[in-house]
């Protein structure tokens, strides 16, 4: 069943332009599902939500959930500004994390020093994982603000 969910998410996220992008989006989706204690279908609903969730983002967030996506976009941008990542790799970077599900889910992203010395772009991997973890936790914390009327929101109205 787990394999099916991962495969289904990869297919659903096939808008991504490379295998690495799909892998990164699947990783992010797994964090969202774990920390939010939600299923695969609910996890996919964030794509295209409001003005900032999904590809692109502009205007003013429609609610706290959408604000999580704006903060996520800004976090990726900050990783680039700080020289940790190249802009072309933010959505294609795969990373490692530890997950504990005893009780409720908790995620600990690997820090730069946790990676083997031969692994390239460790600072980027650590930064992107932390951006994804924070966004997933933000989604979980703000799940009560999630409003179905903002699904597949017309971004040109933002």
From Swiss-Prot:
Gene3D superfamilies, alphabetically?
Answer: Phospholipase A2 domain (1.20.90.10)
Q: In which tissues is it expressed?
A: Expressed by the venom gland.
Residues holding Ca(2+): 54, 56, 73
Cofactor(s) for this UniProt protein: Ca(2+)
Q: Where in the cell is it found?
A: Secreted
**Main location as per UniProt:** secreted
Name of the protein in its database record: Phospholipase A2 AP-PLA2-II
